[in-house]
Amino acid sequence: MDGDEASLVANFCAITNSTPEKAQEYLSVADGDLSTAITLFFESGGVTDVQSSYIEAPSQTEPVEEIRAPIAPTREVLVDPLADMSAGTSIMGNNFGFGGFPRMNRRQRRRMGIFDQSPSQIPFPSSNTEDSSEESDSSSRASRLAKLFRPPYDIISNLSLDEARIEASSQKRWILVNLQTSTSFECQVLNRDLWKDESVKEVIRAHFLFLQLLDDEEPGMEFKRFYPVRSTPHIAILDPRTGERVKEWSKSFTPADFVIALNDFLEGCTLDETSGRKNPLGAKSQKPVEAMSEDEQMHKAIAASLGNGNSTTESQGESSSQQAESHGVADDTVHKIDSAECDAEEPSPGPNVTRIQIRMPNGARFIRRFSLTDPVSKVYAYVKGVAEGADKQPFSLTFQRKSLWTSLDSTIKEAGIQNTALQFEFQ
């Protein structure tokens, strides 16, 4: 035994209080490393037969080292595929700000509804990983709901109330306002069932400027400050000249009923000052005679006595004569129309098919589908077949106070009576 080995044995014995023989055994197993040999000695409980003790120790006394399982991979959607992307922009374009989200002006910032409807939805590339399948199923369901209840952005005007009044006045169109609550399912049903109907859209495009407002955003709150609203959804028609609310509804409509309601309004009101139809604001009524001063009564009497009575009588006579002649021609023309000209079966609904309502004097209504290419005479033929007495007595059909007998050879589309309500009157 050399000096180094003797020193190791002595140190081992001093620390472990064991014999030199045990020290040599443990040092031999530890390849002369004193620290390892001492550790082996205490872990084996000071067993003399270190060879067998060291070999058996791992399975008997030494605990098996536990290796922590790797962290499971997780995936999260950093950008919602239904994020509000403004139409007409691209991901690489300059209209996108920080993080890939589009820069939107004040009019485009619209809160999503309860189904995350957005003006446009730009699909993002999906990864070809196993985890993407579950996400795609959830995303597709959300996408279907968003599409189903999506607001009618194709007919909504992104204007403020003041801007809408200016625009509608220049175009001689009414302002149709729909006030909604973003979390109300009844409001979402309007988007799904009413505003997506093509017949409703057609009437709106022809006669109205359409605004859809949310009651918790500034344009909607401004509307409520000017016009009291009991509940939502709220639908109103505004006169663009004065801003007056001339018609309002707070109930649900079927598309057919709403088209009828709009046509009833258009039948009775006009923005054309030269028209003979009613102004919704009401004509200024003349002051009653008893409320006039003596001077006003005198001026009225003088004006009446000097009012060209003879010329007025002659003009009225000429007008009556012309009307009688016109009615005679119309009656003969309508009388020649055979009710058999109208097909027994209605055409199936489609893009080239419209619904026309006939309102009778007693309040009854007849509704039928016609092709847009059908002549107006076919509507007369239908009326002669369904209206009692129409095949024997002269009658007229009018739309917006204008008789349609002069348009008998025109198509329904050319006459502009698609999705309208016509007034029936016996002559």
Swiss-Prot record:
InterPro entries: Thioredoxin-like_sf (IPR036249), UAS (IPR006577), UBA-like_sf (IPR009060), Ubiquitin-like_domsf (IPR029071), UBX_7/2 (IPR017346), UBX_dom (IPR001012), UBX_domain-protein (IPR050730). One of its GO terms (cellular component) is nucleus. Keywords: Phosphoprotein, Ubl conjugation pathway. It comes from the Eukaryota. Residues 311-326 have a biased composition (Low complexity). Residues 115-143, 273-331 are annotated as: Disordered. The modification Phosphoserine is found at S371. GO terms for molecular function: ubiquitin binding. GO terms for biological process: proteasome-mediated ubiquitin-dependent protein catabolic process. Residues 349-425 form the UBX domain. Involved in CDC48-dependent protein degradation through the ubiquitin/proteasome pathway. Interacts with cdc48. This is UBX domain-containing protein 2.
